């Protein structure tokens, strides 16, 4: 099946991004050299559903060099980079993704990916797993198992497992030390504020920042906001994490109270409807609402 992307002519820019990543990922390169020499995944089909940008694209290319037939699609319509998708197609991978896909297009891309009947899946957010357990059980015939990248997807997996419905083994990559201690805390913590500041052109110093959720992503976001000079307020439903936030030097209160005083609100819970209409009614005019969770459902629009 042919790839479905926005424009193959964008590939040059995508190659440049992936090449830059290549030079800055020595650990993956070392693993990739071994996998390539052994042809570890020869004859295997791997479906990769991730935030499709240069770093994840390079992972897909490493798997491709290790002999796999790699099928790539995005795990969020708002994060796919069209030039990176084009570069992967030029390098011989199959891609079904473009930026700004509608819900219908997004799930069509996922279904086209699963039409390849994977041996292994790499999921980010749990949508591949959800389809395999609902409408696409036919695509499980070769499936050995897979990995899940993020908190949202791991929560969905735990739900299936608790109900006794999980039909194949999944590795919770999000629960590894290197993921949550470094990527979640430091990576998300920094990139969240980079995105907010570039988008709004606001300084953070002196602002009252409300961080919803004090998991590892929330910890990183709060830490970086404090470093930028903000007064940080944390909202958290888990009493242990709430106490941890207090011990880390942050003020803790319910969202109903925080809504009245915050200037910038950032949700990082992996849950839905964290900020709702009753909260927005009590907010000051001109506040900034931002979501750094996987899906765009934490702020009820």
Predicted features by range, described:
Residues 44-49, 71-73, 210:
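Short glycine-rich or small-residue beta-strand-to-loop segments that form or flank ligand, phosphate
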């Amino acid at each position: 099946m042919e790839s479905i992307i926005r424009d193959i002519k964008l590939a040059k820019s995508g190659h440049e991004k992936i090449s830059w990543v290549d030079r800055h990922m020595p650990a993956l390169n070392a693993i990739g050299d071994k996998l390539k020499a052994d042809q570890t995944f020869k004859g295997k089909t791997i479906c990769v559903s991730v935030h499709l940008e240069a770093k994840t694209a390079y992972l897909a290319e490493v798997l491709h060099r290790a002999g796999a037939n790699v099928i790539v699609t995005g795990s969020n319509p708002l994060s796919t980079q069209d030039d990176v998708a084009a570069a992967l197609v030029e390098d011989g991978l199959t891609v079904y993704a473009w930026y700004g896909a509608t819900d219908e297009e997004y799930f069509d891309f996922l279904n086209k990916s699963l039409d390849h009947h994977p041996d292994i899946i790499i999921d980010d957010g749990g949508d591949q797993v959800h389809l395999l357990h609902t409408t696409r059980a036919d695509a499980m015939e070769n499936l050995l198992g897979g990995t899940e990248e993020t908190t949202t997807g791991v929560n969905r997996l735990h739900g299936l497992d608790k109900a006794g419905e999980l039909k194949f083994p999944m590795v919770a990559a999000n629960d590894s030390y290197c993921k949550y201690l470094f990527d979640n805390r430091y990576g998300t913590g920094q990139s969240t504020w980079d995105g907010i500041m570039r988008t709004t052109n606001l300084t953070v110093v002196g602002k009252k920042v409300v961080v919803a959720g004090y998991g590892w992503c929330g910890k990183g976001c709060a830490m970086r906001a404090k470093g930028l000079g903000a007064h940080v307020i944390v909202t958290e439903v888990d009493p242990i994490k709430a106490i941890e936030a207090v011990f880390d030097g942050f003020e803790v209160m319910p969202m109903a109270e925080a809504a009245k005083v915050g200037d910038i609100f950032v949700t990082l819970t992996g849950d839905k409807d964290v900020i709702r209409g009753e909260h927005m009614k009590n907010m000051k005019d001109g506040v900034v609402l931002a979501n750094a969770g996987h899906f765009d459902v934490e702020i009820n629009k």
